[in-house]
From Swiss-Prot:
PTM characteristics: The cross-link permits a high resistance to proteolysis. Is more resistant to specific proteases than to unspecific proteases.
Coiled coil stretches, renumbered: none
Protein name as annotated: Pumilarin
Maturation-removed propeptide residues: 1-38
Record function comment: Cyclopeptide antibiotic that inhibits both Gram-positive and Gram-negative bacteria. Shows potent to weak activities against M.flavus (MIC=3 ug/ml), B.cereus (MIC=12 ug/ml), B.pumilus (MIC=12 ug/ml), E.coli (MIC=12 ug/ml), and S.pneumoniae (MIC=47 ug/ml). May act by forming pores.
UniProt record, GO biological process: defense response to bacterium; killing of cells of another organism
Crosslinked residue numbers (Cyclopeptide (Leu-Trp)): L39-W108
Subcellular location: Secreted
Record organism: Bacillus safensis
InterPro entries: Bacteriocin_AS48, Circ_bacteriocin
Length: 108
């Protein structure tokens, strides 16, 4: 089996996925460890407002992660469909050239 430059090795993909999940877990853990009281004292805001701000930041991070995953899957899927379509058209034209001849296919 020949490899092309565009192939992604499965172990590299799973390694990157594992690193991503580890970073997400560490980020979530660090947000939980931030003391709300210190945040409130530093900026002079009530503790309830500080808790809401932290929850919004954490939710924003989750939304960003989900959008990034969907974008990656979508762009990879579209390029795969485009490549399959290109190969299908190429094969169809080769078959038509064999049946009708090159000049007939060009005139068609």
């Amino acid at each position: 089996m020949t490899e092309t430059k565009n192939e992604i090795k499965l172990h590299v993909l799973f390694g990157a996925l594992a690193v991503g999940f580890l970073m997400l877990a560490l980020f979530s853990f660090s947000l939980q460890m931030l003391p709300v009281a210190d945040l409130a004292k530093e900026f002079g805001i009530p503790g309830s407002v500080a808790a809401v701000v932290l929850n919004v930041v954490e939710a924003g991070g989750a939304v960003t992660t989900i959008v990034s995953i969907l974008t990656a899957v979508g762009s990879g899927g579209l390029s795969l469909i485009a490549a399959a379509g290109k190969e299908t058209i190429r094969q169809y034209l080769k078959n038509e050239i064999k049946k009708k001849g090159r000049k007939a296919v060009i005139a068609w």
